[in-house]
């Protein structure tokens, strides 16, 4: 983050000097002007010499939404470093390397249980907490895992509040619900706080290039992506409860996203 802020500060300073005539206009400055003119995050054009995109996280947002996103990310990191205490729920989407945080959950659990790290993976459980502010103040970290928030779902939705049928306690967290069909005109609704738990890999699970497939009828393995571009922005597999055949969600392309496009 500090590197990105430094790059932005210097490029804007150079732009100011260039417009004032105290610095020669370089191609990088011209590319910066071109991006700002069309409200594009500078450097997203592959031919641009402006370095903002190079030091940023994957995103499809336009200039103002991504700038606001950057301020929010900086706020989380600043708060975290000031207290040196892990938040009760981490905004996973706000990390430059979300997979590193998920791996740390596995590492802590492996160390605590004496298990081999490569014999562990993660599973997810949707809580009944609408957002991080809904987590009770006296809550502790869930068993062998952590809370994350800020995810969205595409191709389905997850129930909130009274829609959640028969919530129950699991690992020190209140969880419940299952995948439901999307509402009309609701393209990417948010999901509740997610409980990510480190678990031992079971012999019946099938290893694949994207994670372990459980082959359980009531669990849909939903890919989690950083952006709606999917593909190279893949992070991990989330395990979501379903009461209908899970191939329904495969056909609808149901997946979790870490950020919306706007």
Language-model regions, residue ranges each:
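Long C-terminal appendages of very large multidomain proteins
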Residues: 1-262
